[in-house]
Amino acid sequence: MIKKIRQIYKDFYAEKERNLPQAEKATFLRYCVFRLRYKMPESFYFQNRLYDKQVDPAECLKGTTRVIHGWDISLKRNKPDASLWWRIIHHIDFWFSRFLYPGLDARDYFMYEFYNLKHTLRKTFVTNGYLHQLDEKLNGPANSKERDLIEDKGTFNALFPDIITRKWTVSRGLTREALGAFLNDLDEVIVKPLDGQQGLGIFKKAIHSQEDIDDLFQTIQGQEYILEEVVKQHWQLGRFNPSSVNTVRVYSVFHENQVVITGAVFRLGRTGRVTDNYSTGGMAAEIDVDLGIITSRAVNYLEEEYYVHPDTKEIILGAKIPKWDEIKETVKNAHLRISQFGYIAWDVVVTEDGQVTFLEANTCGGFELQQHPCRKGKKQLYDRFMK
């Protein structure tokens, strides 16, 4: 750790020397505060001349309360029985780690068990802060309207009519009569917020009568929803949990005019749940990108791990993903169509008749699914795309 701090000190003054005389007043201590608060490397600090700005120390440290709160929540969830001595030692270690690995938060620290790792392994993990740097580097500003091409589920579906062939419509401007016509030959429909994330706000509605249609219309009226025909999944995926569509999350990067598949995970829902989302009770397990075989345990947001599905008793480890080569090819071809985005996380499903289709995609797919199941850092894999 001391060696790492010395390296940061050395890098700081090397950058300062390159930016003289404007950076004459830049101090290492002030930079340390910025590094902790804003998770920035030395180059960013100097390139943006943050040493010249009149920064209120109270404003600079405003995030401290949030960080402490995050630590308390993670500690209670992951180490509720930890001794006072353990809590003190590792709380200090956590703050040093935030300095050494910009962007680290308490969830990262506990999820990847930093308290059991040495620096050589800690530095291999992608932190939450690194994710946002990668996202901005490859996809542009987070608030860019262009991201609506992917983040808006209706716009995304319209981009790939040859891949997304199920029936769908959006609630915006939808009349009662148009809704009835859309639902005419459907027994049920899945309803999602147009810009929703993490499986929040999603529900399934059975359609058996005009009363069901009227009830659904009242629910979606004036709201921003996408309504979709329920996907019937391949039996090899559905056997793990029939109540949810169990998806394959594939990560791709557009680099040097080609698409690179950088990772993949299988997401599994729980009995009675409509979605397989990690943040709403689902589980995730790593997939070998070359073989299409699950190579890790499945874990959930609460740090529980499974090698066999707890509800259906299906064996997870070693399971083969159907149509794997076709999944990779479909993702690569789709990414080439929207290559203005450098980093995309695709939610893929194989239908009961073997068609590969998308449920949705995200421009800032988190790394917890890539790193948590296998507890292996993926930073080295992505560093080459940051140059």
Regions found by a protein language model. Name each.
Residues 198-202, 272-273, 368:
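Short catalytic/ligand-binding loop motif for oxyanion handling, primarily in non-cytosolic enzymes
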Residues 136-248, 255-257:
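Active-site nucleotide/adenylate-binding loops and adjacent lid/helix of ATP-dependent enzymes
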Residues 1-59:
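Intrinsically disordered, low-structural-confidence terminal and linker regions
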Residues 241, 245-329:
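ATP-dependent carboxylate/phosphate-activation module, predominantly the ATP-grasp catalytic core
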Residues 186-188, 245-249, 261, 343-345, ...:
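Extracellular structured ligand-interaction cores
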Residues 195, 229-231, 252-254, 268, ...:
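Short, flexible loop/turn elements at secondary-structure junctions
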Residues 3-6, 305-343, 350-387:
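C-terminal active-site "lid" helix and adjoining low-complexity regulatory extension at the edge
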Residues 47-181, 331:
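Conserved N-proximal alpha/beta basic substrate-recognition cap immediately N-terminal to
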